Amino acid sequence: MSALDDLPPLRDVIRRHGLSAQKSLGQNFLLDLNLTGRIARASGPLEGATVVEVGPGPGGLTRALLALGARRVIAIERDQRCLDALAEVSDHYPGRLEVISGDALKVDVRPLVGDGEVRVVANLPYNIATLLLIGWLSTDPWPPWFSSLTLMFQKEVAERIVAAPGSKAYGRLAVLAGWRTTARIAFDVAPSAFVPPPKVTSSVVHLVPRSEPLPCALSALEKVTEAAFGQRRKMLRQSLKSLGVDTAALLKATGVEETARAEEIDVDGFVRLANTFAQLKSGAGAAA
């Protein structure tokens, strides 16, 4: 019998420790061990890998990650109430679970993960999920310290991550994710899977870093996409004026029509715009 089989049911753990999901922390607990196992497997083979988990709560996904062979799990939990429940999981997997009490937005795990393959697998707290993803996608240098991200989001956010040009969901997040990773929605999760059930469907997204994304300065790409999507209904000849360079020259040099709108430009197009913008800005600075 595995250590997972020896652990008490999650509902008993929650009841015994008096746990309830806190809306202020963006919590929704996953109690179905078949589902947590499916999330863990969506990240790929875990044998020998170090896994970073954010927001483990009572430890449902944590159990699955360890049972499926993760060499080590580093779990970051802000909610002090969950620490005793996680300690029980740690006792069943001696030396394999490290729980860090803190805010995932402030904890730098890079010094902790060591050498070898590192994956991030998490049912993210919804109130910080997008901020965490942007932080991971903005990692410097690139390729990053993780080999994949397997993350739960609200479905609307997941669709924004994987959106294609021309769709309503396509925006800055899709450009950043598409530039640095290949991303796909692995599967959807119904509200009934959570305690308490959220009002919306959730989705698990799997992202794999590109080893050699198109050369581009992240800061330039951020400025261009912010300007373009900040006024997404306007033509680029208007929306990009806030960049402070010759918009006509910028668009002509990159082969983009002045009448195009942000949602029509693919990731490669935004990279070209960002690189040309950086050159024009640098030239303007030198001239000054």
From Swiss-Prot:
NCBIfam families: ksgA. Specifically dimethylates two adjacent adenosines (A1518 and A1519) in the loop of a conserved hairpin near the 3'-end of 16S rRNA in the 30S particle. May play a critical role in biogenesis of 30S subunits. One of its GO terms (molecular function) is RNA binding. The keyword Methyltransferase applies. Keywords: Cytoplasm, Methyltransferase, RNA-binding, rRNA processing, S-adenosyl-L-methionine, Transferase. It holds the Pfam family RrnaAD. It catalyses: adenosine(1518)/adenosine(1519) in 16S rRNA + 4 S-adenosyl-L-methionine = N(6)-dimethyladenosine(1518)/N(6)-dimethyladenosine(1519) in 16S rRNA + 4 S-adenosyl-L-homocysteine + 4 H(+). Transmembrane segments: none annotated. This is Ribosomal RNA small subunit methyltransferase A. Belongs to the class I-like SAM-binding methyltransferase superfamily. rRNA adenine N(6)-methyltransferase family. RsmA subfamily. The keyword Signal does not apply. PANTHER family: DIMETHYLADENOSINE TRANSFERASE, DIMETHYLADENOSINE TRANSFERASE-RELATED. Its main location: cytoplasm. It is found in: Cytoplasm. It comes from the Bacteria. GO terms for cellular component: cytosol. Its EC number is 2.1.1.182. InterPro entries: KsgA/Erm, rRNA_Ade_diMease-like_C, rRNA_Ade_Mease_Trfase_CS, rRNA_Ade_methylase_Trfase_N, rRNA_adenine_dimethylase, SAM-dependent_MTases_sf. Disulfide bonds: none annotated. S-adenosyl-L-methionine binds at residues 28, 30, 55, 77, 103, 123.
